[in-house]
Every structure is written in structure tokens, then in C-alpha cells.
């Protein structure tokens, strides 16, 4: 039996194409069936399956957590142990075992550092992405700026030998400068694009393993 394709209503050509892809996306359907808040949950599931980053008892900081797909995955892995601090300026419905902190990670750094003061983080994860500008290079540079912000928190709050997962968009020379700057900070750097990432997407995840100091 052939899978049914959902039809979309009348709208602009670009939004119609996006909506068509979205409603017929197998990961969107799977997320709905398995009660994940977003298809992005499967990206983290793939990342963790490959790299075994999050373990029971770990303390995890998630930056840019709304709507909560990644938070659900991490909370399931921790299973009532450790601690998950999920930070986003956008509203996010509560999840059992998750500390939801509403603030701007760029403009309210002092407040976040006060919140995590004295906390030894095992892992920092981020699925942050910039608003699309229409320029491949601009979007890539903006994504790297967000990743640099994630690394700012890692430098100050991630324990030695800790791990960072952060996303960038490929398409600018800044990527190579940024990644090269990390080689003195982490023992190993891996690039990973999950199957759950759309083929046309330029997103790639940097898996930064073994903070050196």
C-alpha cells in the first residue's frame, strides 16, 4: 500500500514547498507518533548513539532548548539521575526532571553564570541556529557566532574532559578559522550530520570531545 501524501492549501510557492516537505517528512510523523516535541529529537538520538555522550548521573547544560525535543531525549537518558538545565528565551512547557531557565544566553550571561555557579558540567549541547537572512555566507557566519557563544560557556563552566555538541551552517571561510581555534581546546573534533537532518540543509554538528583544561 502506498503512503498517502498530504496536500497543502494555497500559499506562496516557497512556503508551499516547505509545508509540503514538512507534513510529509517521516521524522515529523515519527516525532508525532512517539510524542517528541520536534523532529530534532532524532538528531540528538543519532549523535548520542554514535558518540555515547550522555550518561546517567551527568550534569548537562542545553542552550536553545525550546520547544524541548532534545530535552526529552536527555531527560530519558538521565532517567531521574544527574541534572539537566535547559535554557531558552522562548517559552517551553515543563518536562519532568528538567530545569527550564528562561533567559537570553547572549544578553543575560551574568544571570546564567550565576545560575550555574558552582555546577560542574559534563556536557553542553546546543541546537541553536540563526534566523535565515537569505545569504548563505551571512547565515554561516551567524551560526558560528552562536557556536562561539556556546564555547564561551564551555570555557568557563565545562569540566576538564567534558564534551560539547554545537551546530554550525557550512558556507563561509569563518568555519575553518573557528574549528582550528578549537583544536587547542579539545582532544578530538568530529563533524557529524545525522540522517534526521534534511539533505538540503547545510547544518553540521561539531562534536567536541575531551576538553583539555
UniProtKB/Swiss-Prot annotation:
GO MF entry, a single one: rRNA (uridine-2'-O-)-methyltransferase activity
Gene3D superfamilies in UniProt: Vaccinia Virus protein VP39 (3.40.50.150)
Binding annotation for S-adenosyl-L-methionine: 68, 70, 88, 104, 127
Chief localization: cytoplasm
Catalytic activity, as annotated: uridine(2552) in 23S rRNA + S-adenosyl-L-methionine = 2'-O-methyluridine(2552) in 23S rRNA + S-adenosyl-L-homocysteine + H(+)
The keyword GTP-binding is annotated on this UniProt entry: no
Enzyme Commission designation: 2.1.1.166
Subcellular location(s) of the protein: Cytoplasm
One Pfam family here: FtsJ
InterPro entries linked: RNA_methyltr_RlmE (IPR050082), RNA_MeTrfase_FtsJ_dom (IPR002877), rRNA-MeTfrase_E (IPR015507), SAM-dependent_MTases_sf (IPR029063)
Gene Ontology terms: cellular component: cytoplasm
Matching HAMAP family: RNA_methyltr_E
Role played: Specifically methylates the uridine in position 2552 of 23S rRNA at the 2'-O position of the ribose in the fully assembled 50S ribosomal subunit.
Protein family according to the UniProt entry: Belongs to the class I-like SAM-binding methyltransferase superfamily. RNA methyltransferase RlmE family.
Protein known as: Ribosomal RNA large subunit methyltransferase E
Organism: Neorickettsia sennetsu (strain ATCC VR-367 / Miyayama) (Ehrlichia sennetsu)
Organism phylogeny: Bacteria, Pseudomonadati, Pseudomonadota, Alphaproteobacteria, Rickettsiales
